[in-house]
């Protein structure tokens, strides 16, 4: 594969939206000795371009976490019709990864740093029997959950806070301050849907918050416990990290000046 030589006058920047099933991967990011979504995608894109292609993602999902709408950018001197980046790449990708859209954007765009908001959805099944058809694609608890108590706790997390109690010990962010703009919880019979929106997320932040909400939903702690965790800023006091199975990166928001499509997907509940 021919490595690219950087000259901004000959390079074009392409933005791609893609979906993937994270069950077979060690996460988004390339890592030695394991199969990642990023490595699969870059290999397929390089096949289309005939040159080495590298991508930058809006968010780095963990092992087992899925995406309904991940956003990446790439830079290349190879000219291809936008549809070729979609269909040509999909022809070289495994069935659990698919390019949805392709757009050309100005050189100063960055998939990660230009993003103003990210949205995650978590689908959680609450019933005695574990899921079969949706195994690995939906979270599960065998006990009932109190929707109202979880909603009360969720409201305490909205706003700008220090989320140290909900960050992984491996988190590399220099600050735990984040702006959580939305945390909606809805119930559809036995299925609970959690929607998290923030300017950015800490490592394991969504799954750690979810673990706390589930503790509150089953009656182990009152809703006010969430406020205490925020104040204490101590990860060891919070609930364990919840399963990745039902977690989906579902959208990334960018300023209108980039003239990009709306990268936000809400998957109907009957085709999770």
Swiss-Prot record:
GO terms assigned for molecular function: RNA binding; tRNA pseudouridine(38-40) synthase activity
Keyword list, A-Z: Isomerase, tRNA processing
Enzyme Commission identifier(s): 5.4.99.12
GO biological process, alphabetically ordered: tRNA pseudouridine synthesis
Domain of life: Bacteria
Residues binding substrate: 120
Keyword Isomerase: yes
Role according to the record: Formation of pseudouridine at positions 38, 39 and 40 in the anticodon stem and loop of transfer RNAs.
PANTHER family: PSEUDOURIDYLATE SYNTHASE, TRNA PSEUDOURIDINE SYNTHASE-LIKE 1
HAMAP family: TruA
Name the record gives this protein: tRNA pseudouridine synthase A
Organism expressing this protein natively: Nitrosomonas europaea (strain ATCC 19718 / CIP 103999 / KCTC 2705 / NBRC 14298)
Gene: truA
